[in-house]
Amino acid sequence: MALGVREYRNISEIKGPLLVVEGVSRVAYDEIVEVETAAGEKRRGRVLEVGMGYAVVQVFEGTTGISPTGTVVRFMGRPLEIPVTEDMLGRIMNGLGEPIDGGPKIDADERRDVNGAPLNPAERAYPEDFIQTGVSAIDGMNTLVRGQKLPIFSGAGLPHNRLAAQIARQATVRGEEEEFAVVFSAIGIKYDDFLFFKKFFEETGALGRVAMFVNLADEPAMIRLITPRAALTLAEYLAYERDMHVLVIITDMTNYAEALREISAAREEVPGRQGYPGYLYSDLASIYERAGRVKGKKGSITQMPILTMPNDDITHPIPDLTGYITEGQIVLSRELHNRGIYPPINVLMSLSRLMKEGIGPGKTREDHAEVSNQLYASYSRGVELRSLTAVVGEESLSERDRRYLKFADLFEQRFLKQGERENRSIEETLDIAWEILSVLPEEELVNIKEETIKKYHPKYRAG
């Protein structure tokens, strides 16, 4: 779309961050705009709506100080683009891809549209191959697969930022560590959170393989809508042009949806559920569906978007619609967090729909699927018995039931709980699982084949 620069001075309305420009022609949706005030200050914007002879422009920096007279609006004839290069790894940028770390200007030979290139569905390859995060609750029971989109559902005050930073530092495709990169997109975060991520990546030495796109809470809402798209544009370049395996972590998608609702209200659109626009589903899909693998390309994009559920409500429109688009979810538990368990992952509410594609011989270990199924069944039984114990007392339970109670405690303290900088291999995760399963009678391990028990059960391995 190369329409050339067109200049107009006839602003008919200013409302919130929006300008309505009359008498325009050959203006395209999503076109980038330059707004020059009467005082000579230049601001950037984007076309949100095009009608018969008019265009609605969202000004990134807001419309304060802009008057209908004396203001020049220039339509630039192109969409918003960012530079893309491998040199952006190790750099910290704002939501528009501009460096904010005090380093040199990004020198790139190529610029790309932040909306990404259309991808033919027939060219998609099915997600497969294990991504090791070093977190037992994810690797062992909700395995992340290369090309998958697996969100983390959290709540206010829960340690999702710490978990996101840990995964960004530790995640890797086994055997291809040197070709793995992380693109980290922070949407509407507080400055304290930005400093936490920056310090964590610098101290742990992870910053060299991480490209950070940061949008702070005091920045315009429109930038929140661009930030994840800019991050994914770089991820697509690294994956499909540089053959890298890219993990994209986006936090917090709730801030993104709130910005979308704010802009929708300013445009006076008919609201949908809880005031969010009716196109919330398709808008979220335009971000989540940029994950995946492409036939004939070595690289891949894996997404772990993080969202905080308002009032811990998993039926809220944001997590509800996200669940329809993505391939599972990791759910954080406030009850586990209050008991001092980190990461507080509720495995009974969590699910990775593509787990079966990334585990087993040659990928993780032959016993992985059986052990995971047994952990789910045994922990679920232990949690049920806790509720029963609160009514009848532990003395009323059988010896078998007491073993399940002990297993549930060990599962939370030995398997779920781990250090913030503790990076467990999948072998360590499965070995811990066998240790805690060994407190149960062998006849209770009904989800594991006898030959697998003979090979991996601590009782037989010790012999």
Curated annotation (Swiss-Prot):
Keyword Membrane annotated: yes
Membrane topology category: Peripheral membrane protein
Biological processes per GO annotation: proton motive force-driven plasma membrane ATP synthesis
Predominant localisation class: membrane
The keyword Ion transport is assigned to this record: yes
Domain of life (superkingdom): Archaea
Cellular component GO terms, alphabetical: plasma membrane; proton-transporting two-sector ATPase complex, catalytic domain
Subcellular location: Cell membrane
PROSITE patterns with a match to the protein in the record: ATPASE_ALPHA_BETA (PS00152)
GO MF annotation, one: proton-transporting ATP synthase activity, rotational mechanism
Alphabetical keyword list: ATP synthesis, Cell membrane, Hydrogen ion transport, Ion transport, Membrane, Transport
UniProt-listed InterPro entries: ATP-synt_VA_C, ATPase_a/bsu_AS, ATPase_A1-cplx_bsu, ATPase_F1/V1/A1_a/bsu_N, ATPase_F1/V1/A1_a/bsu_nucl-bd, P-loop_NTPase, V-ATPase_su_B/beta
Family to which this protein belongs: Belongs to the ATPase alpha/beta chains family.
Complexes and interactors: Has multiple subunits with at least A(3), B(3), C, D, E, F, H, I and proteolipid K(x).
Cited HAMAP family: ATP_synth_B_arch
Name this polypeptide is given: A-type ATP synthase subunit B
